[in-house]
A protein has these predicted regions:
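Structural/interface elements that position substrates and couple domains in central-metabolism enzymes
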Residues: 1-120
Length: 120
């Protein structure tokens, strides 16, 4: 998936080690971010629970991004502003590693890691 990105910007949503907390100590998200940076991707981060002046809001994080990468299961990520995401991205792609998103509107590609929602 990463090799097919249109440009080198990835919007990372969530760096806390656990959903709905502000604790990012020893979070695996930082290892993922470091790997992506090493591979020359530009990274923008939005985490509404972690205080860091470098972290931006959803609008700035997704502006001109090629991928939204959800790494934490904060409640805020369950109902994102999909219109804003579509407006900010040339091709809106979301990769949800926490399986917190069930559906997205038309015009957004959603990839869930191990999605079990379709099983009834």
């Amino acid at each position: 998936l990463a090799s097919d990105l249109q440009n080198g910007k990835i919007a990372v949503l969530g760096v806390a080690y656990k959903g709905n907390t502000g604790d990012d100590r020893e979070s695996p998200a930082y290892e993922i971010i470091a790997k992506l940076k090493k591979d020359n991707y530009e990274i923008s981060v939005w985490d509404p629970h972690v205080a860091n002046e470098e972290y931006v809001d959803l609008n700035k994080a997704t502006k001109d991004a090629s991928l939204v990468l959800i790494l934490c299961d904060h409640n805020e990520f369950k109902d994102l502003d999909y219109d804003l995401i579509k407006e900010n991205m040339k091709k809106a792609i979301i990769f949800d590693t926490k399986n917190i998103i069930k559906d997205v509107p038309e015009g957004i590609e959603l990839y869930n890691y191990g999605n079990l929602y379709s099983l009834n």
